[in-house]
Amino acid sequence: DIDIYLMGDYDKGNEAVKKAGIDLRLDFFVHSEFTVDGINVENHLYFVNPNVNRTGEYVQQALLSLVDNYDNHPTVAGALIPSAEFATLFFARHASWHYARECIKLRDICDWGVMLNHYRDCIDINTILSHLENCGLTRFASILTTIAEQILGVTLPLHFSERYEALATRVLEDILSFEDE
C-alpha cells in the first residue's frame, strides 16, 4: 500500500477523493483508505495510533517533530519523502505493531535492511537510537537488524549494544512458520 500524510489536510484529502468519485473507506481510526489502479492508499490522520498506549503517544509526537523540519526531507515531484530518522522510527513502530498482532513477513525484514542500508550515509544514528530507547523499541529494532544482517549478508549502520541473537532466531522462526501457513 501507499501511506500518505497531508500535513494536517486529512479532511481536505478525503474530500478530494470523494469529489473524484473514488470509494473512500473511513473504517479506521488512524487513516482513511481508498484504492487507485488496484493500489490501496492510506490517508493518515495520525502516523500511529497515539491513544493506544504511551509508546503510541510518544512515537506520534516524535514523528510529528521529525516531519516539522522540511529541510531534512527530500522531495520527489513536489512530494516530501520521509527523512531517514522518520522512516526508521515509523517502520520500527509499524512492524512491531504488526508482529504483535499477526506476525510480519520476511519481506518486512528485507525492507528494514534495505532501508537502513539505503540511509547508511545520512541517518542520524544518535537521534534514532534515542527515539527507539524512549519508546521501548530498541530490542525489537535490534532483533530486526540482527535478522536482516543475517539474511542480506551486510553490516547495517544501526548498531545496538545487545543483538539478542537467541531471540532473533526465535523471531525468524516465527516469521518463517507464519509464511508457511
Regions found by a protein language model. Give the residues of each.
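RNA/tRNA-interacting regions in translation and RNA-turnover enzymes
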Residues: 2-4
